[in-house]
Amino acid sequence: MGKTRDLFKKIRDTRGTFHAKMGSIKDRNGMDLTEAEDIKKRWQEYTEELYKKDLHDPDNHDDVITNLEPDILECEVKWTLESIAMNKASGGDGIPVELFQILKDDAVKMLHSVCQQIWKTQQWPQDWKRSVFTPIPKKGNAKECSNYHTIVLIAHASKVMIKILQARLQQYVNCELPDVQAGFRKGRGTRDQIANICWIMEKAREFQKNIYFCFIDYAKAFDCVDHNKLWKILKEMGIADHLTCLLRNLYAGQEATVRTGHGTTDWFQIGKGVCQGCILSPCLFNFYAEYLMRKAGIKIARRNMNNLRYADDTTLMAESEEELKSLLMKVKEESEKVGLRLNIQKTKIVASGPITSWEIDGETVETVSDFIFLGSKITADGDCSHEIKRRLLLGRTVMTNLDSIFKSRDVTLPTKVRSSQGYGFSCGHVRM
């Protein structure tokens, strides 16, 4: 027990697992860059442009809020500090979370004092508004900056205040967000949405009805959130002015650098977006997405569920092609009003009935017979045997990769058995 991290490190070392490394990249004109300084400049140029504020959208800052929410308690700070995971990369200050664990009560008192000062003045230390972006490769050409997730690393000390702020927002999350939004919410997860889609398809087949799904993909959804629109949305949803002011001042004047394989870039300003890797981002994006869905007129009645959401993964559902297209066009229109753009090339339709070819802004929306939805294969005929076969194949591939470990005489039998038993909890129920 307690050696799981070391065990998986040994397994990776033994298997020789491939780790993607950031090598040469292309400039905006498609030319290869190999020099360290050129690569750093390109990463700064790309990321700065990605998070650049729209010039036509001026800031509207309110005065300091005097009607404050209840003070932060020391026990809140202690609980938050204990909940921060160990062995995580540090932010720009380079201070590891283990230091706060060593200091214990002294760290709690010090952080409580700082957090309470922020709470009263709504002003954040500039060091806590500085972030480090780490590019993580996605599928596609690794030489294109756009094929990377820009994951943010923030100071562990600031995480304490951010987690307290997130906890205070939770009551509004539970009140304002519908059950169809399962992204980053306690007691909900990807399996719930997968089960919902399978159940809907099963019922449609049982009552001999056609069902049409549109799986929407947004282009850089989290990175395109407009801050001023976000503050207005929070106000409309009844979020306390004090909490909104704290959020607004956290995002005002944010700075970032990009950590590349050749060192870090110069610091630059962040003008829009909610950064992937910050625990506040999913919560804020869920409010943002809920607002646009309401504006699109998509509401959840007792007997009418026409969408499922997991953060920015949005699925529209209808019983006819015309109804689905109408829903999609409404969502597209309202999304563009708040700065979000649909990626038509990655937006797919799965239909159990007849459907014609669609074009939006000159691009064809592809109709497919199956789609990987939140990690599970959804087929137009609703047959789950395709997903079962896929899972078996994935499992067989993993076992083949681990063959050298399971056959190794250096690994004891109890260790092999114990590692297999540990996966028992994640097995789902399959109706035979």
Predicted regions and their residues:
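Short, conserved micro-motifs composed of acidic
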Residues: 262, 340-369
